[in-house]
Amino acid sequence: MDSVTLACGNGGKETSALIERVFMPYLKEFIVAFDEDAPKFEARGEYCVSTDSFVITPLIFNGGDIGKLCVCGSANDVSVQGGEPLYLNMGFILEEGLEISLLKQILQSIQKELFKANLKLLSLDTKVVPKGSVDKLFINTTCIGKIIKPGISSRHLQPGQAIILSDTIANHGASLFAMRHEIKLKTNLESDCQLLYPLLKPLFLSDLKIDALRDATRGGLASVLNEWANSSRVKIVIEEEKIPLKEETKGICEILGLEPYTLANEGVFVLALNQKDAPKALEILKSNEKAKNACVIGEVLENPYPSVVLKNAWGFERILEMPEGELLPRIC
């Protein structure tokens, strides 16, 4: 079998062959129960659930592919809610004619990330659609996690809190911009796609109170901060020069006239906590090499009108608006 055929979606021999020969070599070890439409699992305590769909193009990009992205993206949504990712459900929409070699490459990435995340698969589904109905491959995931750090909410911001950023921003969005065929830029910049739970677990196990936490995906840093300001009815002031930004990312943004604060990230989080706890939080984060750039970028102030203000090195301020319009479709 060199490519996916419509017969691979008929529920018969061809479907069984696709599952057994292509999917199972990579995913079998993670599946909770075979031959069941709805596997059972025990749950005690508080849990959280997140569903996401992945339609990124190209399927393979600098720093990852749709396989790595779908596991990390779904697990990260659970992690930033204070949860430990435990289970994943996956649905694959395959285009007729999709190369089996490409599918295997993506499944191998999924296998690698599932192992890293210690995730189990509860259920798995495949559908095949006629050529042209989708662009090669779409993946839907649902992640289930157990809350180990309760009390995290976008409604919990208060004056006197510090805003911490875990790493340099806009690398995923900028690298995707550079890769698209219509923008012929040569760069070694890679997506920041990664699992966030290993970075967050030490914080969760500490005695620190985390008030708000979010991964800055679509809409970037600007989207997260504006959602927080509106949900908690506060003013957030960000020091522009404190936001870590790679030179390559900065260059791409300047050439293309992009605002790095609105570009997507896939391995960066923002958190809010009491200012007095910020030094300890940074110490914990920076003990992991992948969070060496973590820093305080701003603070929460009292204000009757929710807003996000960006202050430059000269003290001039401007409003950082919620992103509007479609900058780059199919970013994740």
Enumerate the language-model features and the residues they cover:
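Solvent-exposed alpha-helices and their adjacent loops that cap or buttress functional pockets
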Residues: 31-33, 40-44, 114, 130-136, ...
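Active-site-proximal betaalpha loop/short-helix elements
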Residues: 95-97, 189-265
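Glycine-rich phosphate/pyrophosphate-binding loop regions near the starts of catalytic domains
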Residues: 5, 13-165, 171
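N-terminal amphipathic/basic leader segments beginning at the initiator methionine
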Residues: 1-22, 320-328
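Helix N-cap motif at beta-to-alpha junctions
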Residues: 273-279
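Acidic, Ser/Thr/Pro-rich beta/coil linker or hinge segments at domain junctions
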Residues: 287-332
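Flexible, glycine/charged-enriched surface loops at secondary-structure junctions
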Residues: 30-35, 118-124, 207-216, 237-240, ...
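Phosphate/diphosphate-binding glycine-rich loops and adjacent basic-rich segments that engage nucleotide
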Residues: 146-192, 311, 330-332
